[in-house]
Amino acid sequence: MKISLPAFEKANVLVVGDVMLDRYWSGPTGRISPEAPVPVVRVNQIEDRPGGAANVALNIATLGGQVSLAGIVGEDETAAALTQGIEALGVVPKWHTVAELPTITKLRVMSRNQQLIRLDFEEAYPAEQSLALLASAEKELDKVAVVVLSDYAKGAIDKPEAFIAKAKAKGVKVLVDPKGSDFSRYRGATLLTPNMSEFEQVVGKVADEADLVTKAKELLKEFDFEALLVTRSEKGMTLITADAPELHIPTVAHEVYDVTGAGDTVISALATSLAVGCELPVACALANTAAGIVVGKLGTSTVSRIELIAALNLSHGESGYGVVSEDQLAYALEQAKLKGERVVMTNGCFDILHAGHVSYLQQARALGDRLIVAVNDDDSVKRLKGDGRPVNKLDRRMAVLAGLASVDWVVPFSEDTPQRIISRLLPNKLVKGGDYNVEDIAGGKEVIAAGGSVEVLGFEDGVSTTAIIENIMAKQ
C-alpha cells in the first residue's frame, strides 16, 4: 500500500515515564595519569541530550506532534539542563519535582569515539513518588488522544494499571514501551511494543513464527491488551491483535549503524500516527519506516517529518524530482546542498506557458545546478490576475513546467507572494523576471541574509500570457 504522511501537527500526545539526561564529556587522550594506570582525557566538548522518556517526547515533537512530558526530576542543575533541552524543541515539561532525589543522569566520558567510562547518577524512586507522578499526569488526559508509558525500570511507572484504566475510560489510547518480565503491570493497555528479547523474557523461547503469534495472543487475552507489536531487528515487526490475522512488516533499513533509541522512535511514530486517526496497520508501517531511518544514524537520534516523507517516497519508487510538496522539496534541497549543488529558485503564475517562459527558465537554470519553480495556486492567480484566470488549472500548469528539461522541482504556494516559502527554503540564488529592483523582490532579503544572491532577468520582448489571451479573444 502507498502511505502518505498524516497531519502530525494535529497530534496531541502525553509521554509519562523515566526521564533522564545523557551527558557526554569528550576530548583527546595523550597520556596516562601519574595517579593511576588510566588515560587522561582533556575535555573540550560537553554535550547534553534528553534521554529515556524524554527522547520519546523529542521524537514526537520532531515529527511535528504536540507533546507534553511527565516525569520525576530533582531540584538540580541537571533538571534545568533537561528542561532547556526539551523546551527548545517544543516539548512541554510536566515535572514532578522531588528535591531530595537527583535527576537521573548518565555521564559518558568519550575519546576518539570510544566510551571510556559511564557514571550513573540516580536513586530508586519511592513508590509514593510514582503514584504522585501518575496522579498529576491524570490531569492531562482530557487534552490528549494518546498516552505513551515509557518504562526504563527506574520507578517512575511503578503501578500504572489504575492510570491506564482512567485513560481508557476517557477514550485515550495507551501505548507502552515495556520493561521487565511482569507485563501484568500494564493490564488493559492499548498496545505494547516489546522487542524480541523483552517478549521472550515474558513468554519463554519462541520456536518460530506460529509460536510467536500463539504466545502473543495468549498475552492479549491474559492481560486485556488490544495489540502487541513485537520488534524483531532485521526481521522487521509483527503486529498481533485479537480479532485479525497477524501482520508481518519487513524491515526497511538499508544500512544499520546503531540501534540505540530505535524503540523510542517506533513508539513515537506509532503514538503520533494513532493520535491523528491512522489505522493501526498504517501506524505500524510508518513506525517501521521511521525505525529504518534512525538505525542508519549514530547515537540516540530522532526522525524528522522531511526524512520520513523522503523515505516513503523512496519506498514507492518516486524519484524526488518533478512536482513535489513543500516538505519533500525542503528535504531534496537539503540533500542537493550537501552535494555542493547550487540551487536556483524562481516563481510565477505560468498560466499559459510560452516561448518567453521557456527562454527565461533556461537562463535561470544556467545560473546553478538545480532549478525550483514555485507556482501560484488557482486562488492566488485569480486574486492577482482577475476573473477568468487562470486559464489552466494548477495541476496542468505544474505538469507542463515539470516536463521542461530546465526545471528540477515544481512546488505550489497559496499566498499572493512567495515570501514565506522562499524564506523557508533559502535557495542559493533567487531569480525574478522583469524590471524589479532587487530590494523589492519577495524573499530577497532573507536569501541575501543567508549568504545567497538575487538576480533579475529580462523577459523576451513581445511575448506574454496577457498578449496571447488578448490575441485569442480578438480572433473570436
Swiss-Prot record:
EC number: 2.7.1.167, 2.7.7.70
UniProt-listed InterPro entries: Bifunc_HldE, Carboh/pur_kinase_PfkB_CS, Cyt_trans-like, PfkB_dom, RfaE_dom_I, RfaE_dom_II, Ribokinase-like, Rossmann-like_a/b/a_fold
UniProt-annotated binding residues for ATP: 195-198
Active site annotation, chain numbering: 264
Disulfide bonds: none
Cytidylyltransferase: annotated span: 345-476
Any GO CC annotation of this UniProt entry: cytosol
Metabolic or biological pathway, per its Swiss-Prot or TrEMBL entry: Nucleotide-sugar biosynthesis; ADP-L-glycero-beta-D-manno-heptose biosynthesis; ADP-L-glycero-beta-D-manno-heptose from D-glycero-beta-D-manno-heptose 7-phosphate: step 1/4; Nucleotide-sugar biosynthesis; ADP-L-glycero-beta-D-manno-heptose biosynthesis; ADP-L-glycero-beta-D-manno-heptose from D-glycero-beta-D-manno-heptose 7-phosphate: step 3/4
Gene Ontology MF term list: ATP binding; heptose 7-phosphate kinase activity; heptose-1-phosphate adenylyltransferase activity; phosphotransferase activity, alcohol group as acceptor
Pfam families cross-referenced by the UniProt entry: CTP_transf_like, PfkB
GO annotation, biological process: ADP-L-glycero-beta-D-manno-heptose biosynthetic process
Alphabetic keyword roster: ATP-binding, Carbohydrate metabolism, Kinase, Multifunctional enzyme, Nucleotide-binding, Nucleotidyltransferase, Transferase
Region (Ribokinase): 1-319
Reactions catalysed according to its record: D-glycero-beta-D-manno-heptose 7-phosphate + ATP = D-glycero-beta-D-manno-heptose 1,7-bisphosphate + ADP + H(+); D-glycero-beta-D-manno-heptose 1-phosphate + ATP + H(+) = ADP-D-glycero-beta-D-manno-heptose + diphosphate
Subunit structure: Homodimer.
Function statement: Catalyzes the ADP transfer from ATP to D-glycero-beta-D-manno-heptose 1-phosphate, yielding ADP-D-glycero-beta-D-manno-heptose.
Family the entry assigns: In the N-terminal section; belongs to the carbohydrate kinase PfkB family.
Protein name (Swiss-Prot/TrEMBL): Bifunctional protein HldE
UniProt organism field: Shewanella loihica (strain ATCC BAA-1088 / PV-4)
Gene symbol of the encoding locus: hldE
